[in-house]
Amino acid sequence: MTVIQSSTVIDVQNASYCIVIYASGNWRSLSLPNGIGILGRWSLLCSIDLELRPSDRHNTPPVAIMISPRFIPVGISQTIIVPTMDADNDQVRCRFANTTAECASVCPPNSLPIGTIMFPNCTLLITGSNVADWYAVAIVIEDFIDSTASLPLSTIPVQFLINVQQKSSCPYRPLLTGPTTSSDQCIGIKVGTSFNIELIAENFCPNSTIIKDIAILSFRFLTKTPIVQNTTALWSVLLTWTPAAVQVGSQILCAIAIDSDNVQSNQYCMSFIVAVERVPSCPGQIIPTTVDPTTLTTADYITSTIADSTTPTTVDYTTASEYTDEYVLSI
């Protein structure tokens, strides 16, 4: 499975600040809020500050993406990290969406199980209540000029689905790795330069279990080969990408391996900075795929009572482009 981002370019002139809202429906049938069923609407709000920074250049908003849906086993607390990147190296914080314009029918706390936590470092802790439950997660990513700032420079929504599944008989999930040693590394790349990425999925379960897919959430101009079994335990795909001029700025690629028991691997992500003239340096980094307990503070908690029902839609998120005066609304 490969999910491609689509973009709408909006030319903003003679404005210092603007808000872009995309609202429609419907989500697929959801388990929460109680009784929502197939009536869930979505709304995504992106705020854009067009005033010059102290460096006399426009702000570059953060980029964030998520593979959707994410499968989690019932009754087991799960940690899900939302990969983010900010080309200005601003402080990036995450929170739950909290207004009708930001989340429509799926605003927390009623849209998620009790005890769900969203930490400012973009770490989500969630425990699925019932097998076959579907939840829509509505998160807002914001960048701040420094750690003391309270007003964000921009607001970027990320919305994705979670599906609760029966526990697998095998206690191990697949491991997905790539060319970088960890997902907090950034790669500079020049427009027109071909770049190959081999993703390798390892199976730790009995031989009856296989890796059936390596799913990718990618940008344009990227190709993917069919999945290949290399050994009894290893499968791989090869990605090839030649960035175009329209991709100048920050890009994030994410992937997940899925085995024949429908168990998902870790989400593996790579971040890129694209430039026209030369290979650029990387001023920002994406959130690491390991959790530092010392950073899990001042979280958003879900403490309301809940019930259940059924299922949601596709990955929906909004980003604004980088290094230009145009902003791109990606859904």
Which residue stretches match the model-derived regions?
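Extracellular mucin-like PTS segments
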Residues: D143, D259, E277-I331
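Long, compositionally biased, intrinsically disordered segments
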Residues: M1-P288
